[in-house]
Amino acid sequence: MSLIECKNINRYFGSGENRVHILKDISLSIEKGDFVAIIGQSGSGKSTLMNILGCLDTAGSGSYRIDGIETAKMQPDELAALRRERFGFIFQRYNLLSSLTARDNVALPAVYMGMGGKERSARADKLLQDLGLASKEGNKPGELSGGQQQRVSIARALMNGGEIIFADEPTGALDTASGKNVMEIIRRLHEAGHTVIMVTHDPGIAANANRVIEIRDGEIISDTSKNPEIPASNVGRIQEKASWSFYYDQFVEAFRMSVQAVLAHKMRSLLTMLGIIIGIASVVSVVALGNGSQKKILEDISSMGTNTISIFPGRGFGDRRSGKIKTLTIDDAKIIAKQSYVASATPMTSSGGTLTYRNTDLTASLYGVGEQYFDVRGLKLETGRLFDENDVKEDAQVVVIDQNVKDKLFADSDPLGKTILFRKRPLTVIGVMKKDENAFGNSDVLMLWSPYTTVMHQITGESHTNSITVKIKDNANTRVAEKGLAELLKARHGTEDFFMNNSDSIRQMVESTTGTMKLLISSIALISLVVGGIGVMNIMLVSVTERTKEIGIRMAIGARRGNILQQFLIEAVLICIIGGLVGVGLSAAVSLVFNHFVTDFPMDISAASVIGAVACSTGIGIAFGFMPANKAAKLNPIDALAQD
């Protein structure tokens, strides 16, 4: 059985009236260890035949077998395996990757074989040394002469063993001396047992082969053996290694090439990232603003009392009949305070009237409350003391004032111990509250607090309260407590003539509202991310077009479609991840500036938003990078190699 066997191979280019018959019923066989020169003039079809033999192209009809296996039935990755494991290509124009060193160019086929990094580099160095390039391992193609580049190409062809060497006009771009050197190397490869198939138009070059096949107008016109065949010997073949290092090395190589591609076009890459940067920065900043404002509002709500339920007369806020309902009493507050889930209950009554100190009259609001009211509402004392349980029991004529009252009446003096009149009733100032700055603004209303017994018995003369504030124990469910209080009061009053305001309901409403707003604004900001993703896809399509030749070279040395797909997909994801990280950094910088100048509420960048931003940018890279990457992976090797 012959190593290579072709029967009735035909190849056509074009279609319809422009269809050209390039190869016409080509039949030949090549034995293991042959050195075959295919000679012919330009346009004769010799290069097309070699491309088919090298599995870079496919025949229009006919049979092509390698070791008896029909190649027409092979999938693209199976053909890539042949090129990777058994073939080695020496091109007329060298086809080296300009961004890689000589060592890396030579080692590249072994990446797709799964060879470890150290072993790969050592083998590449040995091949370069054997070809007289030991001192050029770190040089890039642009730093080498034509002859040196071709020797690098030969070393690359041998990296995975190169059982069958395909040489396409190997001396065509070289001077005479370099050409002779290259031909001497090829002859030595043949003598070492490699099967060599060489294409040339020069009879002098063809004379180096032991068999010459001449093609004219797509047909074989002669097939002669000029020299005795050299007995074939086994050529060492590198075995593919399917291990974790196999996938790791391929990923590292793809990542490195992606970084080089991004850095090769810095400005273009930056402009491509711009849409991602703006989108991510917008989303993270909006979420940070939402988090900051939500946190501030919830803190303010907490400062007004957490786990609290306020009970009011009537059916709800704005109920005109609530003023006529007088069933909410001190006894209700006392019964409520005895419930197992209640920490405390404080009634509250209020009265508006004239506040007088010396010759100054002001309009103020006096609130009659229990001694626990301040703790429940989170109000802080600045100076003096708060009234206690005894003050409540004894109807003590004491009062605690707010900062507004202090500023109006005692701007230049200490208010403690002073007597003020409210609705002509004397009250002694025993304490001053701190300014209560919360999300609902700073009221200019003058506020005072006295024991509810004092207000009810000495000022309003009423026996009912305006409200009852209930503090629920920390281990109790406020929803269950609210339901229990409602049933208790309904039983006492005989009707539901009250309504409740649960602080947790306000908290949940704020969280829900701010969450909805964050989602809405983030959705708008996401539009810029989509635009950025389209920009990435556009640039990646341009990159595929620009690097078509590189794709062809990688396929020729054995890259699978998955390898090409992976490389371009990594490049797209890399651009988006870098853009995402820069966007997060930009948002962090904005938040620092914002928090420096704005003190009402901070921008709060959470770890979740950062992780989400990076994940989102990665997803955009995958989503918008897949089409260009898939286009690159589906290129035909010979078509890709033909691009300049």
Swiss-Prot record:
PROSITE patterns per UniProt: ABC_TRANSPORTER_1 (PS00211), ABC_TRANSPORTER_2 (PS50893), MACB (PS51267)
Membrane topology: Multi-pass membrane protein
Primary site of residence: membrane
GO molecular function, one term: ATP hydrolysis activity
GO annotation, biological process: response to antibiotic
UniProt keyword terms in alphabetical order: Antibiotic resistance, ATP-binding, Cell inner membrane, Cell membrane, Membrane, Nucleotide-binding, Translocase, Transmembrane, Transmembrane helix, Transport
Pfam family of the protein (one): ABC_tran
Domain of life: Bacteria
Domain called ABC transporter: residue spans: 4-242
InterPro entries on file: AAA+_ATPase, ABC3_permease_C, ABC_transporter-like_ATP-bd, ABC_transporter-like_CS, MacB-like_ATP-bd, MacB_PCD, Macrolide_Exporter_MacB, P-loop_NTPase
EC code: 7.6.2.-
SUPFAM superfamilies documented for this protein: P-loop containing nucleoside triphosphate hydrolases (SSF52540)
Localization annotation: Cell inner membrane
One GO cellular component term noted in the UniProt record for this chain: plasma membrane
Function: Non-canonical ABC transporter that contains transmembrane domains (TMD), which form a pore in the inner membrane, and an ATP-binding domain (NBD), which is responsible for energy generation. Overexpression confers resistance against macrolides.
Cross-referenced PANTHER family: MACROLIDE EXPORT ATP-BINDING_PERMEASE PROTEIN MACB (PTHR30572:SF14), MEMBRANE COMPONENT OF TRANSPORTER-RELATED (PTHR30572)
Subunit structure: Homodimer.
Family: Belongs to the ABC transporter superfamily. Macrolide exporter (TC 3.A.1.122) family.
The protein, known as: Macrolide export ATP-binding/permease protein MacB
Originating species: Neisseria gonorrhoeae
Organismal lineage: Bacteria, Pseudomonadati, Pseudomonadota, Betaproteobacteria, Neisseriales
